[in-house]
Amino acid sequence: MLLDLNVESPERSGTSSSSVLNSGDAGGGGGGGGGGGLFRFDLLASSPDDDECSGEQHQLPAASGIVTRQLLPPPPPAAPSPAPAWQPPRRAAEDAALAQRPVVAKKTRRGPRSRSSQYRGVTFYRRTGRWESHIWDCGKQVYLGGFDTAHAAARAYDRAAIKFRGLEADINFNLSDYEDDLKQMRNWTKEEFVHILRRQSTGFARGSSKFRGVTLHKCGRWEARMGQLLGKKYIYLGLFDTEVEAARAYDRAAIRFNGREAVTNFEPASYNVDALPDAGNEAIVDGDLDLDLRISQPNARDSKSDVATTGLQLTCDSPESSNITVHQPMGSSPQWTVHHQSTPLPPQHQRLYPSHCLGFLPNLQERPMDRRLELGPMPFPTQAWQMQAPSHLPLLHAAASSGFSAGAGAGVAAATRRQPPFPADHPFYFPPTA
């Protein structure tokens, strides 16, 4: 008996088959047929070319030997391609990931569609309950109007897009639907066409009227008024018998305040803009307000200001002398009349007192010409007064509010007695004009 272990294929490593060769009677001494018998037993698994299960007897010629062959040749092992020396392994992995990434479609320059509508340029507003249409032009959003349906708002957007951007514009519907509009919009500017679209919208009307700025008053007449302007909630324009009259009154006021860019109910060309009065001359604006920043100067020739014309009165009080009053009326020559015990002073000794003069307490007051008040003596210490003023005293600069220069002054005669040192904290004061 001969055992033969053969490996049939590389994929089935570890799988072997054993064959038992019985050649005991190969010389012709066995039972029946003179040919040698070959018996093969599979211990683990059978090869694909075995037709029957293990234990089946295969009759092979005696002269043939056992042949082991491989049906499918093994594929050669794939060697990994080496990465370039200048490229790191991580960079190669990133390039491979980018190559497998799907290509994203490029966005259009018109912007994304509206989230609240399936149409471009249409948005639904819950506060108003309308579909409003807008279009972007030169970085600004232009309002086209409010509509009851999204379809009508989309139509308005398409017309504006064709007018603003030409036939290559991105629109919601086909271009052939707007052939009639193309013929009409050639004669209009962008502003005029936007006004036409707004007038066609349902959001253009306010109140219970189809015209802008017109409402039905409770008295049965039509009221015209403008919205927020000059910090006011609204401006009342009046009551009219018909809607058209009220609408035209609103149009005139809108053109007056907003110029040629005003949104009107009718064509702005139907109004004579040059003949309309200015906004400052109308009763609806506070025209009496004078906002100029300036200081008003009184008129000296006015009868009211003549009563308040003031002069300068100088009163000097001392225990041993009577009141000394210096007064100059407005409009006369700058000569001061000084009364000292009913005796006028010589003009060569006319001087004004400084703030620290000895022996006198100056009291400059502004009084009207027709009312001359006599002031009582100022309180002084009870001690005896002895003073001797110098013959020449420095000039006193007049107050800025009195209107007199330093040269227009009057002097007081020098006293013959000496006074004790007088306190220096006695400034001039100017009480308000009566």
Curated annotation (Swiss-Prot):
The keyword Transcription applies. The keyword Transcription regulation applies. Residues 12-23 have a biased composition (Low complexity). Keywords: DNA-binding, Nucleus, Repeat, Transcription, Transcription regulation. Residues 104-113 have a biased composition (Basic residues). Residues 25-38 have a biased composition (Gly residues). Residues 72-87 have a biased composition (Pro residues). Its main location: nucleus. PROSITE patterns: AP2_ERF. A motif (EAR) lies at residues 291-295. Residues 1-116 are annotated as: Disordered. Residues 118-174, 210-267 bind DNA. One of its GO terms (cellular component) is nucleus. Coiled coil: none annotated. It comes from the Eukaryota. Probable transcription factor. Involved in spikelet transition. Together with SNB, controls synergistically inflorescence architecture and floral meristem establishment via the regulation of spatio-temporal expression of B- and E-function floral organ identity genes in the lodicules and of spikelet meristem genes. Prevents lemma and palea elongation as well as grain growth. This is APETALA2-like protein 2. The gene is AP2-2.
